[in-house]
From Swiss-Prot:
tr-type G domain segment(s): 27-209
Described function: Promotes mitochondrial protein synthesis. May act as a fidelity factor of the translation reaction, by catalyzing a one-codon backward translocation of tRNAs on improperly translocated ribosomes. Binds to mitochondrial ribosomes in a GTP-dependent manner.
Gene Ontology MF, one: GTP binding
Domain of life the protein comes from: Eukaryota
Organism: Laccaria bicolor (strain S238N-H82 / ATCC MYA-4686)
Protein's recorded name: Translation factor GUF1, mitochondrial
PANTHER family with a match to the protein in the record: TRANSLATION FACTOR GUF1, MITOCHONDRIAL, TRANSLATION FACTOR GUF1-RELATED
Amino acid sequence: MEEFPCDVIRYEAYVYGVCEFRLPFFLPSRNFSIIAHIDHGKSTLADRLLELTGTIQKKQAGKNEQVLDKLKVERERGITGKSNHSMIDKFKGKDYLLNLIDTPGHVDFAWEVSRSLAACQGALLLVDASQGVQAQSISVFHNAKERGLKIIPILNKIDLPAAQPERIAAQMQATFGIDPSDILHISAKTGQGTQEVLEAIISRIPPPSGRIHAPLKAFLFDSFYDRYRGVISLINVQEGVLRKGDKISSCHTRKKYEITELGILHPEEVPTQSLNPGQVGYIACNMKQSSEAHIGDTLHRAGEPVEPMEGFQETKAMVFAGVFPVDNSDFPKLEESINRLTLTDRSVTIQRESSSALGQGCRLGFLGTLHMDVFRQRLEDEYDANIIITAPTVPYKVVYHDREVIISNPTEFPEVTDATARVKEIQEPVVKASIIVPEEYFGDLMELCYSHRAEDLDHRYLDSGAVSSRIMLNCILPLSEIVTDFFDQLKSRSSGFASFDYEDAGYRKSDLAKMSFLLNGKPVDALALIIHRSAQEAVGRQWVKKLHKVIPRQLYEVPIQAAIGKKVIARETLKAMRADVTAGLYGGHYERKMKHLENQKEGKRKMKKMGTIDLPQEAFFDILSNKS
């Protein structure tokens, strides 16, 4: 692989070779992120910027590569997980190194937005000129503002017939206090106005501060795993110079490493001889475990300790689910696949789990339901895993008289109706939700929130005009209510116009209980749920009907029950298959026929008493889907 000397300013891969341009002096840089609501055009704008600077080959209009979305699941779902690219642009006869530290747009990955912004001095706030300011536009704006970043407001998709740039610019002024004259109007798809974006990055965003002769101080903001080189850390050099062969130490773990490779992403990995103050790049240092690359850690030269920079709080799993192989003999392979995948996604928590119905598996913790779905799809795409995922749950807090316990597995939830359990109260996690919706759908959205146990509702008008007025609805919602079908119902009731964002708001006391499902009087542990009492009867009836549809008929009658403690709240009966035991009788007395029927009845009674119902794996697929 070609290596940059420390003063290379451009690296372009052409069809017939590699071209390098060098400068004999230090190259000024700008570190920035693109922040926006999901689907407002972050990846497309990044493609245009990379094309304009010659970092990637220019494509025809509309044929962008979505360079930031490297995973198959990211391209299919239109989401960006995490990325980092360097490019070089000339402004007023001078070359600049521009480091794009991209951020995900979905609410599940808000934690990754925070860590990306920590390595930047500026942010491009992208707003769709047809959709306007959305819920996550507001949250990412405040996140960037709190960190003191210079914000460049941009209206994207001005080429759309439905675009209303003047109205949306006024909306941004009212919501963010932004001067409309500072807003850039672009179309990332066609490239219109994107050159002005590059100029604004250089002229408006301040350069990173840092002294080249100061002791080394580098900020670790991300990492990924390479099967040959181990953990690759993405860093922002704050002060000093980092070179290949340097010995470094971690402020967090106190472990020491030697730099075996370092460089920039342009857009793929390009090794360099050094990283200077303000530059963003990658390092390989024979780090074996992802847990060693502590996000927010400060790296310094071994033997030259420095004051550590402010780090981050650890990620907190918000949604838990059991993952089991369809074939129990595949568990070792599944466990190895999960462990490998978590090397590239450190926010997933793992714990072994055993189920009498599904066998051996793992209980995984995720940042949200989209994160869970992305992880599942990556398991299937990259490791060809055939898995069953149980219904998602959230971490509940069980308060006893002498202690508190966090429980994320329904099978471990105590029977609150049992006085001997000594449970003082149950608390559930809640979130502060923000919903932006056109006025005509406001009533439906209020009803949706109330049906999902929303509290402390308030609202305000964001804007008004000839076309429509939009309302921001704020409320406190139980996390368990939004990990199921809340988002789908939100989009359905608003015809797709509502946007949704939330943040953790701690725990609140709640009236919850464990619902068990019994087949022939025996509980199925993999189907246990934790349900609020207001929804127990409806959920119980819904699930027993689902079970009734998918369980194969037996030779004896099978009662299907939903129970809270010892109280049965819903029941369906699966009728027995009838075998004609009198078919072989060609005559004789009536009592002979009755004797055969009585023997059959007695046999079925014994089978019902002794028999167990084995749910086929196909039945679990149907039951654990969201289909009713």
